[in-house]
């Protein structure tokens, strides 16, 4: 223990000697009272670390000083002023008061500075030195060699670890909660080489669906017209194919033709996978925030498309309805004619008695019955299709009227809003 303390003390003394003094200068020191006045003597004062050196002459070596005081024995340095004194010395005096501890024999020191500013400078320097001296005493802890703490990682080589770059999932999570309207998320999706179909707007998809429905409607009408014309020509010529299978005999083909004639309905969207949902998350947020703008754009597109295609479609549908009605009437007349022929054939069959004539008449009757049934089925299906076309025409007219009413209602609202904004 004594060896450790002596080693620390020697090291501190060496540090104090090598360090530069904090403050030096000439100050008058109080040396006692005479018969008529106080005795003040000029002294050279050096403040170095926690030691205060006082000498009669200016010296550079601390060994030649006359007095040395340890500031750890003192409590504070403060201004000393008498209340009734009017002398100039009263504004420049300061004292160094010792701490009131048992066994402390350090004297109180009184100094007189050259000016009040110099006095303040000395007070601040001495107080800071006293604080450091007290902290030095508290920080001194002697530890035996046997109780030293071991540091197994002190001599280990230190490696600088660079920061790991953020993962893509973290960037997506930050972008989804950011206030930039999903722009960062859109940039990340574009980096993944997404298809251009995923970035199409609602307005373009609606226009594509509407164009598809109109094209399919027109194609279905033309296809049904061509088939009906061919059938009517074959019926008039009297050549009825026996094993020919038309589109009216197959229920699946009939349903397809009817579906092609009706208005196109969009399919149910398929379920998206987890990765696709992550891709479309930001787009859903943007669309939810801009529902009003998209609705206005969709309404304008619907109105423009209906106004452009409505007159032509109505005229075509009316022509198709007229053709269907004419063909149904022709088919009904043919069915009636075949019914009369059937009766005549039955009368002839009863009058004939030979086996050869009876077999041929039976085959002819069966063929006529089949043809009449087929013609009757075609007539009924054509009639139902014509009724559906009429219903579609009525629905289109109602839709067009509703659009016109909405336009009429929106115009006064827009004009009133414009007037309010002008006011």
UniProtKB/Swiss-Prot annotation:
Processing after translation: C-terminal fragments could be released during apoptosis via caspase-3-dependent cleavage.
Localization per record: Membrane; Nucleus; Cytoplasm
Location, primary (coarse class): membrane
One Pfam family recorded for the sequence: PH
PROSITE patterns the record matches: PH_DOMAIN
Domain of life: Eukaryota
Biased composition (Basic and acidic residues): 222-259
Region (Disordered): 1-21, 81-100, 217-277
PH domain ranges (all copies): 20-131
Keyword annotations from UniProtKB, A to Z: Cytoplasm, Membrane, Nucleus
An annotated GO cellular component: muscle cell projection membrane
SUPFAM superfamilies found in the cross-reference section: PH domain-like
Compositional bias ranges of the Polar residues kind: 7-20
One Gene Ontology term from the biological process aspect of the record: regulation of myoblast fusion
Coiled coil: none
Keyword Membrane found: yes
Function: Plays a role in the regulation of the actin cytoskeleton through its interactions with actin capping protein (CP).
Protein name: Pleckstrin homology domain-containing family O member 1
Organism per entry: Gallus gallus (Chicken)
